[in-house]
Amino acid sequence: MNAEIIAVGTELLLGQIANTNAQFLSEKLASIGINVYYHTVVGDNNKRLQQAIEVAEERADMLIFTGGLGPTKDDLTKETIASSLAEELVYDEKALASISDYFKRTGREFTENNKKQALVLDGATVFANDHGMAPGMGLNKNGKVYILLPGPPKEMKPMYVSYVEPFLRNFTTGENIYSRVLRFFGIGESQLEVKVQDLIDGQTNPTIAPLANDGEVTLRLTAKHQNVDEAEKLIQHVEDLILERVGGFFYGYDQEFLHDKAIVLLKKKGLTLACAESLTGGLFGNQVTESAGVSSVFKGGVICYHNDVKQHVLHVPEEVLFTDGAVSKECARYLAENVKELLEADIGISFTGVAGPDASEHKEPGTVFVGLAIKDEPTVVFPLNLSGSRQQIRERSAKYGFYHLYKKLEEI
């Protein structure tokens, strides 16, 4: 079954709020075998909403609406659909009682326009709103399925999970969609795609979809099958083929992120970490502390933005700063080694570079050095040549720090 999601609300068109409902619904619908081929956003206008309905009816089996179920005059979704389908709007007694009870409990006047929220399409299946007032509804008519949901995500999402998805399963074939995301770092999207292009072109089940984001690349493997075990086998076979070619850049699955993976390895190996941040200005340390229980492995950090701090706190020799510069391999080495000693950690990591937009020390923006000093191991400095905005260079530098830390921890 093919679906179209129609988000109703002028505030969406104006960019005042993001359409997170469409993302949530697309993912949920895909998981039960409903294909979403179109996303439409339309303002609070009866004529334009009617046009959107007519277009969607030509190309989709299921029309899913979010928004426009509230009490105000510009909440037109129910009225427009009722007119389009020649259906009456009737009061749902349970919803009306629930709304009335809310106003009594809060001591507010139950105005006539608020009763409007209890109106539903005659003959529709009503979805209770456990987190708001306006109920949702589903109606199967003229070979099409119409789903109406409230706009606020805090109301729509729990309604979907509790009531809408069980209703929708009546219209699916039983074939479900299963996905697995493979995460890679240290290789560009184009480089990775070249290495697996024949697999991307040749696969229909599962499919392979590459996506680049903030310096890393993901491959989403998606399989369709009625049986979860068979779907897992399909995905695993393709994953094995991919990792044979680019496994050296692979670091995790789905919602596993570099900083979490590095922290897990630190805990597993019983090692402690300290950081010296010039270029990144605390970004690395901030991401470290996003992980729960990290105090057992993270000693702390020094933000050494000014050369005085590099020299007098982290003891980078004056001649290094004068001759090689703060943005140099030598400076990164001293910073990593000395922050390790200063904070009595097993590992020291450092970041120095040029974030831009202007050059510094005759070095171009994106020139970065990441130092890594590990006890009983030779210090390593990783030179980077990054592109992007000032913020992107800083964020990608921190991510490269986690990547190199993770890879070194895997080796020792």
Curated annotation (Swiss-Prot):
CDD domains from the xrefs? Answer: cinA
Q: Which domain of life is it from?
A: Bacteria
In the record, which residues are listed under signal peptide?
none
Hey, which family's this protein in? Belongs to the CinA family.
Q: What is this protein called?
A: Putative competence-damage inducible protein
